[in-house]
Amino acid sequence: MRQLAAGSLLSLLKVLLLPLAPAPAQDANSASTPGSPLSPTEYERFFALLTPTWKAETTCRLRATHGCRNPTLVQLDQYENHGLVPDGAVCSDLPYASWFESFCQFTQYRCSNHVYYAKRVRCSQPVSILSPNSLKEVDTSSEVPITTMTSPVSSHITATGRQVFQPWPERLNNNVEELLQSSLSLGGQEQGQEHKQEHKQEQGQEHKQDEGQEQEEQEEEQEEEGKQEEGQGTEESLEAMSGLQADSEPKFQSEFVSSNPFSFTPRVREVESTPMMMENIQELIRSAQEMDEMGDVYEEENIWRAQSPGSLLQLPHVDALLVLCYSIVENTCVITPTAKAWQYLEDETLGFGKSVCDSLGRRHLAACSLCDFCSLKLEQCHSETNLQRQQCDNSHKTPFISPLLASQSMSIGTQIGTLKSGRFYGLDLYGGLRMDFWCARLATKGCEDNRVASWLQTEFLSFQDGDFPTKICDTEYVQYPNYCAFKSQQCMMRNRDRKVSRMRCLQNETYTVLTQAKSEDLVLRWSQEFSTLTLGQAG
């Protein structure tokens, strides 16, 4: 069983889950509330499908490597909660661990401590008492509508897509096998190409629920913008854009700078600012056009239409272009709603897709969710030549991240560690947080957690040296198939007061090459060791 490949895991889990499908129908006549724990009888049926223990261990292996957001595991968790995964604290029948901050944490605890058949039970106290207030303050705001459950139908807009630990969207419509094949790969982040589908589903469903409220908000914002922009020049337009950005992220910027930088990016998605920002940018463009004399407008439009596709000047008006550039240059590009909206605008109107390349043959690297796009836009905004975005193909061979983006990243708390004799221990800081925090998050949330994946990818790209720059070797001459396995080993050794660094892979050296199965074991072992450590400290 320990040598099961990802494809075998998938096939096995599909077999395990197939008998679960009739379960909701069987309980349709029961009085159970969606999101409530299973009854003892229902748990007997549920656990029977995960017996013997190797079946439960198989699901735990997948959970350790992919986290709770894997679509197959989402389906499993939904069945364990009458079709809806709860958001917030849950309680268990374990006498020494009676409650957990989330259902995901509960399932990971079961796996790490081999108590595969522990049950979720109803809490004797209200969830609000059990849930720490600090978590709510950090990851929610008064302007973010909070949904408390997630369902198979509306999983893109629900609470499990917005839990504190994993804010990125559900992948229920993805090909599960494709996700498994990229489980520990740094290239496995698919969130860019899913944005259109996610936006359409969210727009269709959320607007039905909050249509009246959103219309009022949009009318108020448009009215405010009309007052701000009427009869004003480019300078006032820049100020309007700054005010507009402040409206879109009321408390986030200050919280971001003072507390936890990379938690801001998921919250931009939660605010659902993209559609509104799109309308605001388009309104700003229209207002900027009206500010000039009609003849000048026509000249500008003719110039714009003459531009080739992908040119930064393809935006309808130079003033609007200045506004957009000003917004991303004067702020930290990767955390601005402007950049998110601008990216969406290009995806929708120009159809470039998630890869970002330019007319100089460069392929901008996606070290974070907006890093590649911001790298290009910062270059375009500062360029004196007509730098264009292009569809990526084999001619774009030069990997590139703009130094302008790197200089901005220092303001969001990322610091590169020192390089000594071809060795690299890791980032001193990422998102303002030290390695111990990220090791703990890796152990509890898994490699596929959005923030963990961004940390891994940024660190991986920070050290490219040796005969094989993209391969991963360490100072104990072990070669890893993916960076998550290496970091799990490094975190585990750090916990044991042993230092293991990444080292350049050389052609004339011999390395112990880990298989994919053994790399998954490393991730699981670190998760188990961390769980044991925290349990010991708590007890």
Swiss-Prot record:
Residues 212-238 have a biased composition (Acidic residues). GO terms for cellular component: acrosomal membrane; acrosomal vesicle; extracellular region. Residues 186-259 are annotated as: Disordered. The keyword Signal applies. The gene is ACRBP. Residues 26-106, 315-423 are annotated as: Pro-ACR binding. InterPro entries: Proacrosin-bd. Residues 192-211 have a biased composition (Basic and acidic residues). It comes from Sus scrofa (Pig). Residues 26-269 form a propeptide. Specifically expressed in testis. Keywords: Cytoplasmic vesicle, Phosphoprotein, Secreted, Signal. One of its GO terms (biological process) is fertilization. The N-terminus is blocked. This is Acrosin-binding protein. It is found in: Secreted; Cytoplasmic vesicle, Secretory vesicle, Acrosome. Residues 1-25 form the signal peptide. The keyword Signal applies.
